[in-house]
A protein has these predicted regions:
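Conserved anion-binding
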Residues: 12-24, 98-173
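Structural preference for beta-strand elements that scaffold enzyme active sites
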Residues: 2-6, 47, 75-79, 100-102, ...
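Short, acidic/polar
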Residues: 29-40, 86-91, 146-156
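Glycine-rich, proline-tolerant flexible connector loops at the mouths of alpha/beta enzymes
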Residues: 47-65, 105, 167-176
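Catalytic cores of alpha/beta
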Residues: 74, 78-97, 182-218, 239
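Glycine/small-residue-rich loop that forms an oxyanion/phosphate-binding "nest" at active or ligand-binding sites
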Residues: 54, 62-119
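Glycine-rich phosphate-binding active-site loops on the catalytic face of alpha/beta enzymes
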Residues: 92, 96-113, 169-171, 198-203, ...
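Alpha-helix-loop-beta-strand connector modules within alpha/beta enzyme cores
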Residues: 59-79, 114-130, 178-197, 202-203
């Protein structure tokens, strides 16, 4: 399971959204977006998810040069979303080095356009689906219901050529609820493309459950993290060690409790080290 580290950009700065919505609360971070991206990668993230909040909220693309700079200066695949509404915007992001581009509202309200974009960029377009409690999909920044529901939309957008599906649950983080495993199971049984869980991770136990979720031999391909770590729910080193499966039996996969104990032991014996790779090497040989 890949670990997608989120970098939210608003007014050229890195921000955290405690309630998952830019309209509710925004915390500006000390690190700039490039520093934040480098920080995630240095700690072990093997994917980045950049969300352009200015583009999403106002159609303002002032952050595009900064996004291109981040892409050029990290050595992991970067998925970019936020306000992507036209073929020209998709072309610009992919030309700038984006590995994948995420589309949300546009994929829902103009499936012909989405089909054309997927055709022009095979394997490069992900659909972001914001799911309401009744499985209706929200659009336009959670402000409207689309009238379409999860299962039918998965089928339609898969047929259109979506390379992946990123599922978020509207309001779930604000209510401190776990990921919606029923919706993830539905997605895994409905489409063959990668399914990414975004939001709802309250702690390592939820991350462990996502890692171990399996339906007919299929598993969640990735999980998006960011504010869970800056809020102190767990460390990135813990997340990296938990989602990586290459340790294999008899050493892993690790349970959340085992991982917390291992990290405590490591920190006690290596007080000056904050390097994720060193911790993982130690863990593998422990």
């Amino acid at each position: 399971m890949d670990l997608y580290a989120r970098v939210n950009i608003l007014e050229g700065k890195a921000v955290r959204l405690p309630r998952g919505n830019v309209k509710d609360e925004v915390i500006f971070l000390e690190a700039n977006p490039l520093e934040r991206a480098h920080g995630w990668v240095s700690k072990g993230a093997n994917r980045l998810l950049i969300v352009d909040l200015d583009a999403a909220a106002h159609g303002d693309y002032r952050n595009r040069p900064m996004i291109n700079e981040i892409i050029a200066n990290v050595d992991v695949p970067v998925q970019v979303g936020g306000g992507v509404r036209s073929p020209a915007e998709v072309d610009a992001l992919i030309s700038g080095g984006a590995w994948r581009v995420t589309m949300g509202t546009t994929a829902m309200v103009d499936q012909v356009l989405f089909w054309d974009i997927c055709r022009d960029h095979p394997g490069r377009i992900a659909a972001s689906l914001d799911v309401l409690p009744d499985q209706e999909l929200a659009i336009r920044g959670w402000t409207e219901g689309s009238g379409s529901y999860l299962e039918e939309t998965l089928i339609e957008l898969s047929s259109a050529g979506a390379a992946a599906f990123m599922l978020s649950e509207v309001g779930r983080d604000a209510l401190n609820e776990p990921p919606n495993f029923d919706n993830l199971r539905l997605a895994l049984t409905t489409v063959e493309e990668e399914v990414i869980a975004a939001g709802g991770v309250r702690g390592l136990e939820d991350l462990e459950s996502l890692r171990d979720l399996e339906v007919d031999g299929r598993q969640v391909g990735g999980v998006v993290v960011g504010r869970e770590i800056t809020a102190g729910r767990f460390t990135f080193e813990e997340a990296v060690a938990l989602v990586r499966r290459e340790f294999g039996p008899p050493k892993g996969p690790w349970s959340a409790e085992e991982l917390q104990q291992a990290l405590a032991t490591y920190q006690a014996s290596h007080p000056a080290s904050a390097d994720a790779e060193a911790f993982l090497s130690w863990l593998n040989g422990a």
